[in-house]
């Protein structure tokens, strides 16, 4: 496949050894007081979509598993664990996604994908409480998305 005359290919990891790979990504969803209260109440919508935090956690886990389908150069790898932590603060929600694998390539993109989808899902779950009079989101935003840790360890 070419793009602009250049050859594109997925990185060949055949010669790499299998290692334990861990990555953690974190980010923040800034919300209004009404949005934070909607998260705290466990009710995402007057018509009942479910608990915003639990739905966002499930979405994050599913997104981690779907990363190779969404990010073209990510290898399909054996994910051995996903932990999603959510902390509700007075001005929004902090989320972190930690991904573990035994493989030949890292899991940073998987952690980032899980995090972003988790935060977007959380926004979707409480958007009714975030809209202003014109139906806009002047205060709601996703911030500080980053990889906070990457670990590579030899398999025992």
UniProtKB/Swiss-Prot annotation:
Subunit structure: Homohexamer; trimer of dimers.
Keywords of this entry: Lyase, Molybdenum cofactor biosynthesis
Alphabetized InterPro entries for the sequence: Mo_CF_biosynth-C_arc (IPR023047), MoaC_sf (IPR036522), Mopterin_CF_biosynth-C_dom (IPR002820)
The protein, known as: Probable cyclic pyranopterin monophosphate synthase
The reaction(s) this protein catalyses: (8S)-3',8-cyclo-7,8-dihydroguanosine 5'-triphosphate = cyclic pyranopterin phosphate + diphosphate
Signal peptide: none
Binding site for substrate: 109-110
Gene3D superfamilies named in the record: Molybdopterin cofactor biosynthesis C (MoaC) domain
Residues that span the membrane, as ranges: none
This protein's record includes keyword Lyase: yes
EC number: 4.6.1.17
Function comment: Catalyzes the conversion of (8S)-3',8-cyclo-7,8-dihydroguanosine 5'-triphosphate to cyclic pyranopterin monophosphate (cPMP).
Active site per UniProt: 124
Family: Belongs to the MoaC family.
GO function term, MF aspect, one: cyclic pyranopterin monophosphate synthase activity
Origin species: Methanopyrus kandleri (strain AV19 / DSM 6324 / JCM 9639 / NBRC 100938)
GO BP terms: Mo-molybdopterin cofactor biosynthetic process
Pathway stated in the Swiss-Prot or TrEMBL entry: Cofactor biosynthesis; molybdopterin biosynthesis
Pfam family of the protein (one): MoaC
Source organism superkingdom: Archaea
């Amino acid at each position: 496949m070419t793009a602009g005359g250049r050859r594109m290919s997925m990185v060949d990891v055949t010669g790499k050894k299998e290692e334990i790979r861990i990555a953690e990504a974190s980010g923040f969803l800034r919300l209004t007081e009404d949005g934070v209260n909607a998260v705290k109440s466990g009710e995402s919508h007057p018509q009942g979509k479910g608990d915003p935090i639990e739905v966002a956690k499930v979405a994050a886990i599913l997104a981690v598993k779907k990363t190779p389908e969404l990010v073209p150069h990510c290898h399909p790898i054996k994910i051995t664990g996903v932990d999603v932590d959510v902390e509700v603060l007075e001005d929004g929600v902090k989320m972190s996604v930690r991904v573990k694998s035994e493989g030949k390539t890292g899991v940073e993109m998987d952690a980032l994908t899980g995090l972003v989808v988790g935060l977007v899902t959380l926004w979707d779950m409480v958007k009714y409480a975030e809209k202003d009079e014109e139906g806009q989101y002047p205060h709601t935003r996703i911030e500080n998305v980053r990889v906070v840790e990457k670990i590579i360890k030899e398999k025992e």
